[in-house]
Amino acid sequence: MNKEEIVKNKIYKIIDKISIGEIRKITKKCPSLRGILLGYLAEERFHKLILKNKKINDIRKHDDHDRKNNKADRDFLYKQKHRISVQLKSVQTNSIKWDEKNKRFLATVQNDASCKREITLPNGEKIRTTNYKVGDYDILAVPLYPFCSKWIYAYKLNKNCKKSTYKKYSESQRKYLLSTTEKITYPLEKGWTTNLDTIIKEVVNENNK
């Protein structure tokens, strides 16, 4: 074992000694850690979910640090021929509100990259931004666990997500950029669905036009 491996091994040993109680306490106190932990948990649960779908195979998980080339958390083949990409995002805990008038929950989903990177827009312009482009992925998936205590996901087409209104970008740029936040309600509004097969078929039909 070389010196680098010895140091790395010490870090793993520290992790092994952390108790479940400590993890729970720290996670509840730290919103950023909570977001990271729940985000990865949502990814793993989604992976298990699509493994059960016999129409889906060749599931791929991309490097989290390679967002220049890969904009989705998972992609897979549907019916052996349609490559579908899914971006998983979680509800922001502190954004959850109860709408008494309409008897529903309101919340915000953070729908952007973790750090700025240079992107090229369809009109040829290059900008540095955390915003996703329209079409960077096919489907936005959001776990509904905070509302129903079950690992059920809400799905929305990328093309139907809110576009950016940020004044820093010109009108010609904004039409190619998604907003960094997406509103969600529970029960779900029109545009969202819990049926993955249904929304995949919408993607396939759109791509076949």
Question: Could you tell me what each predicted segment is?
Answer:
Residues M1-K54, D58, D63, N69:
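Interdomain/boundary linker segments immediately adjacent to catalytic/signaling cores
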Residues I50, R74-F76, H82-S90:
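Conserved catalytic cores of phosphodiester-cleaving nucleases, focusing on short active-site segments
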Residues Q80-H82, V134-G135:
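Short coil-to-beta-strand transition motifs
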Residues K89-S149:
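Catalytic cores of nucleic-acid endonucleases
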Residues F147-K209:
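Non-catalytic C-terminal interaction segments of nucleic acid-processing enzymes
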